[in-house]
C-alpha cells in the first residue's frame, strides 16, 4: 500500500479525533469561566476593567483560532503517522525481494515523515507547554 493511500485512509479518523479533543479542551475552558464568573456575571459585564478585557479578547480571536488550527493539525498529523505505522504489513523472507525496490524508493519519504513528526513534537511541546500544564 502506498503512503498516500494510507494517509487518506486515516485522514478522516484523525480529523474527527482532533476535533473531539479540541471540543473537550474548549468545553473545559467554558466550564472554568462559568464556574468563576457564574454568580457575579452581571457585575462582571458592567465592570469597566472586564469590558476592557473582553475587547482585548475579541481583538485576539485570530490568534486563538490560529492556535486551535495548529493544535488540530498537530493531533491529526500524529494520528495519521501512527495509523500508517500500525497498518504497514510486515515483510517476510519470501516477499522481501519483491518489496525491496518499493522500500528503497520510499525510504527518503519515510525518513522525512519521521523527521517532520519529531520536529512537530518538539516545537508544539515548547510552543504550547503552558497550555498543556496549566492547573485548572
UniProtKB/Swiss-Prot annotation:
InterPro entries: DUF5426. It is a single-pass membrane protein. Pfam families: DUF5426. The chain crosses the membrane at residues 14-34. It is found in: Membrane. One of its GO terms (cellular component) is membrane. Keywords: Membrane, Transmembrane, Transmembrane helix. This is Uncharacterized protein MG441. It comes from Mycoplasma genitalium (strain ATCC 33530 / DSM 19775 / NCTC 10195 / G37). The lineage of its organism: Bacteria, Bacillati, Mycoplasmatota, Mycoplasmoidales, Mycoplasmoidaceae.
